[in-house]
Amino acid sequence: MVNVRPAGPDSWPDVATVMGERGDPSRCFCQYFRLRGKAWSGSSPADNREGLHAQVRDGELPPGVVAYDGDAPVGWCAVGPRTSYPRVVASPNWRTDHLDGWVITCFVVPVGHRRKGVAGELVRGALDLARSYGAPSVEACAVDTTTAGRIPSADLYRGPLSVYLAAGFTEVSRTSPQWVLVRRPAG
């Protein structure tokens, strides 16, 4: 059974395990939406790793949630106030009138744990975290997997639309056939 907990100083080794040592997560460490322009283009994988480590270790708010199957970490979801993500604030994909809400920006579910409901549990955990900090709503820019052929797993880091709809999110707008802004009250 999968359980989800907010990321905190003690969970850093688990977050690092989920990110792995190869592939996009091991280079980005969920910093893409937190950095813009030269701050992003000039950052190295080591810089990004240290950025997330500092957020997990020292942040006022947990920067996300970690999913566990027993004691084994099996997933990560980045979630936080919209204002924590400068790239989200500036992006046309995230245009909204809910500026005080929270956003889910990223999922990482390692190979071997996919298609087992981990992403759905991560969304529920992200909603719980947002609610516990008084967020009025949570938004995400989901991927509609029904509008195209096979979508590579690396392109699903924002989360499939079907996972959000199953968790009670509703479609707000589309910036393309594939990118769908979804929202749900946090409560």
Q: What kind of feature is each model-predicted range?
A:
Residues 80, 141, 175:
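Conserved residues at the C-terminal ends of beta-strands
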Residues 123, 130-152:
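Conserved GNAT acetyl-CoA-binding A-motif
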